[in-house]
Amino acid sequence: MTTAARPTFEPARGGRGKGEADLSQLSKQYSSRDLPSHTKIKYRQATQDAPEEVRSRDFRRELEERERVAVREKNRDRPTREHASSVSKKPRLDQIPAANLDADDPLTDEDADDDSDEDSDDDTAALLAELEKIKKERAEEQARKELEQKAEEERIRMENILSGNPLLNLTGPAQSVAAFKVKRRWDDDVVFKNCAKGVDEMKKDKRFVNDTLRSEFHKKFMEKYIK
């Protein structure tokens, strides 16, 4: 059974809890963000370019020393590379004297490589020529399509101009004259139209009658739908 409906005989009163002897005393709870965080000055260490270290260093001497080390390393690697390149080089066919050539001697691998290189160069040239031809054909096709599109747009524009202006409409005399007839408004034959105007302003073939049964609209309606 719930105890939510029971009356409170002893309500809570402030000043009697733990740490609440004096209500006028300020709270002693602090947040960690209210406390001072940086309480010590950080000094530069020995390897962080302190002003004393910068004054005592000789930058020119250090730069010259680094340059000498780089040149020494470069010269150390150069003879090995030159030796390897000289060993890898083989005498070409055109460099061999004619006296050393023999008809029975087979061609070396380098000659075969030269032939294959020439064949590959020819194939590459043929492929490049074919690619240029394809690009040229595509460019011509694109230009032709653009010209056709422009011509079609110009034709549609001229048709719209000629059909929109009756003075420039050159479709021929077979066109009906009814196309130039101005349409009447839907409220031209209503009863109470232009009631405030005078009788002289109205047309002679129309007369205003302030009677629904004797009006022109009622007569037309009866003749059209009843008779």
From Swiss-Prot:
Cell compartment(s), UniProt: Nucleus
Keywords: Coiled coil, mRNA processing, mRNA splicing, Nucleus, Spliceosome
Coiled-coil segments on the chain, per record: 121-165
Key word Coiled coil present: yes
Biased composition regions of type Basic and acidic residues, renumbered to the chain: 52-84
Family matches, as InterPro entries: Cwf_Cwc_15 (IPR006973)
Compositionally biased intervals (Acidic residues): 102-124
Residue ranges of the region described as Disordered: 1-130
Main localization, broad class: nucleus
Polar residues bias locations: 24-34
GO BP term, pick one: mRNA splicing, via spliceosome
One CC-aspect GO term: U2-type catalytic step 2 spliceosome
Spans traversing the lipid bilayer: none
Molecular-function GO terms, alphabetical: RNA binding
Subunit structure: Identified in the spliceosome C complex. Component of the minor spliceosome, which splices U12-type introns.
Protein family membership: Belongs to the CWC15 family.
Reported function: Involved in pre-mRNA splicing as component of the spliceosome.
Listed name of the protein: Protein CWC15 homolog
